[in-house]
Amino acid sequence: MADKSFDIVMVGGGSNSLVTAMYLTKFGGLDVGIFEARHELGGGWCTEEPVGGFMANCCSTAMCDWYWEPIKRDIPEWEEYGARVAQSRVGNVVLFSEDQSCLTIYQSNFDPTQELTAREIARFSKKDADTWLWLWDKYKNVWSKYVKEWWWNPAQPFDKQDGLDKLLADPASGADPLWLRMSPMQLYKDLFESIEMRIAFQRPNQSYGINTSEGGGGFHALMNTVFASPNWSYVIGGTHQLAHAAQRVIIENGGKVFTKHPVKNVIIENGKAKGIRLEDGTEIEARKAIITEVNPSQLVHNMIGKEHLSEKIVRRVDNLESWFINITWYTWCLKERPHYLAEKFNPDCGEGATCLIMADREDEDYMVKDNIERQLGRRPSKLNLTTVAHGWHKDDLLAPEGIDFNILTEQFFLPDYLLTDKEWKEFEKTHAEEVIELWQKYAPNMTWDNVIGFNPITPHYTANFAKNFGPAGNWGVIDMCASQMGRCRPIPELASHRTPIKNLYGNGAAWHPMPGAHGMQGYNCYKILSEDLNLKKPWKEKGAPW
């Protein structure tokens, strides 16, 4: 006999589990129990305080204005409880080392037509400025509706059109089918004539989880370029506020949360998931369904057991790639903001800029080299650094009053398993020194005298933060290569959230459509459950397209 019983049992309380649980409790009216191994909920919605008053996001930090769009539509109190975001004036800025000039992409809230951005691009190429305005027009008037249909619906079978298929089939989209086959670097060379624009989005693509040199990622990279670069936002008070707000919605609607309750496995009887067994031996009954937010390997080998699955599913999961999206995020607590030499070229590249990329014109294929080195298991021979700055206003609650901002530096590195614990500890310090050395070349005031403290997040930290990010310490759980996107993510047999075990569902960043803190998987998982369990569908009641 089970020790406890719920309608729905959730294994893991990460961001997507919280989204699904909000819907299950509010619209499904179901009794939900969430069992989380860590001391708190949220997964990648996490924030720490390394120095008094400074908030450091340890995973998801830069969001976009289209994140959580249907969730806020259906559950408006979530925003009221703390899921609030803000934007700065500038999105991406590329700093060029040769002459300390810069290419500036303004945010859509400040530059809704992108004419100001086009003016900046025209300083390097009038033709590329026109191309940017063409892309922006396509994004606003054609692409957006199709891409959102792809994002906010479960993975479709291969014999049924999804949103991306419809986009490519619409002559008004202007999309070239060849872009689907190209690498991002090939696509940028196809679209832009200037070195500056070809370089501008290579490094941000890496931040999205897309390999610049890999075939099949071109159109996905282009979508992220246009959808994200002018649309960055950040969570007021730190990303973990999203988890606090979601937990409040869940508890108000009858859900229950159990932290420090690691799950050992799913209990399976006659091909059906009946409950879970905790590591301490406690058994929890699931009357209707079990939803896991573990990685695909954990789902197959730990939660289910490969004896319950086909050899094909086990083999495909074992062959998933996770070497690429392994990252360092160092949040820097500073006395004053960096003063960039490029502010003489455009003053807006300093205060108010979100993402700054440090680049060299002479090295157009710099990201290709970085990717090859890391794929061979070698440390990158050169820093390809970007900074992510948030705040600038005391109401953003991200730093002590009078400072009012925080800045994170990001560098991709090797997977956790390639270095020892001792090597990672040494790397934490040496990487900080390398960052300051490079940063000074663009902002001379960025010396150690300006540093109060820093929070070093490495792939080693991420792999040990929560098991589903392991063994690589991959922020996307698995990579976003062409064979692991959309209806193929993580594998076609699991992409719809349903598993071969009745009443058992997979969820999380490793599922369709792409990794991130946007909650798409959690929303789409509820859509599948609403079909299987005959639950309310608030999007239909509101007449929404998705």
Regions found by a protein language model. Give the residues of each.
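Mid-domain catalytic core of redox enzymes
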Residues: 264-398
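Rossmann-like flavin
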Residues: 98-214
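A conserved FAD-binding loop/helix module that cradles the flavin
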Residues: 509-530
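Active-site-proximal substrate-binding core of FAD-dependent oxidoreductases
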Residues: 268, 532-546
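N-terminal glycine-rich phosphate/pyrophosphate-binding loop and immediately adjacent elements
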Residues: 3-148
